[in-house]
Amino acid sequence: MDKFTKLTGVAAPMPLVNIDTDMIIPKQFLKTIQRSGLGKNLFDEMRYNQDGTEIADFVLNQPAYRQAQIIVAGDNFGCGSSREHAPWALLDFGIRCVIATSFADIFYNNCFKNGILPIVMPPEVVAVLMEDARKGANARMTVDLEAQTVTTSDGQSFPFQVDSFRRHCLMNGLDDIGLTLEKVAAIDGFEKAAATLRPWV
């Protein structure tokens, strides 16, 4: 998992509430267990017409936001079914941070496990960030996980809070496997001691 320390990039405004996981990655794309390749179908039914052509006014199809790395969204982002493909699709597209007033719990947890930083901000702050995101590619937002701040293109800075353990994992690029590998020496020591104490096992 890639480390997340500080990100400066284009933020895409998505002022919608209840963006669910089926909107993020529709069910017909869930047949794979590969984490790569899902980005092209991110928000598929919002990005494309039935004939496969792009819907021009969808934010991620607009030239200013095609390389967006941050999404600023409305309330209850990631609700619906608990598919882990949703953060996989966001990450594969290039999204490393989602800012919203609230998240569905399972989606929120899955983001941290897949290298995406979900940030909860109060509505008045999200409104400011949404307006800044509407400035397009010339306005670049900065998310500093170490300082726990989001800074707009004009220098306004807003604090946020992240659980210290999750912050540690993101900043060090540690998923569940990485966390286990940090304890390899302790695990080996335990197994050797257990083998000595209980050789019949």
Swiss-Prot record:
Q: Which InterPro entries does its entry note?
A: 3-IsopropMal_deHydase_ssu, Aconitase/3IPM_dehydase_swvl, AconitaseA/IPMdHydase_ssu_swvl, IPMI_Swivel, LeuD
A cellular component term from Gene Ontology for this protein is: 3-isopropylmalate dehydratase complex
Q: Identify the keywords attached in UniProt to this record, alphabetized.
A: Amino-acid biosynthesis, Branched-chain amino acid biosynthesis, Leucine biosynthesis, Lyase
Annotated family:
Belongs to the LeuD family. LeuD type 1 subfamily.
Tell me the domain of life. Answer: Bacteria
Q: What is its biological role?
A: Catalyzes the isomerization between 2-isopropylmalate and 3-isopropylmalate, via the formation of 2-isopropylmaleate.
EC assignment = 4.2.1.33
Name the catalysed reactions. Answer: (2R,3S)-3-isopropylmalate = (2S)-2-isopropylmalate
A GO term, aspect molecular function: 3-isopropylmalate dehydratase activity
Q: Which Pfam families match?
A: Aconitase_C (PF00694)
For this entry, list what GO says about its biological process.
L-leucine biosynthetic process
Name of the protein this chain belongs to: 3-isopropylmalate dehydratase small subunit
Q: Does the keyword Amino-acid biosynthesis apply?
A: yes
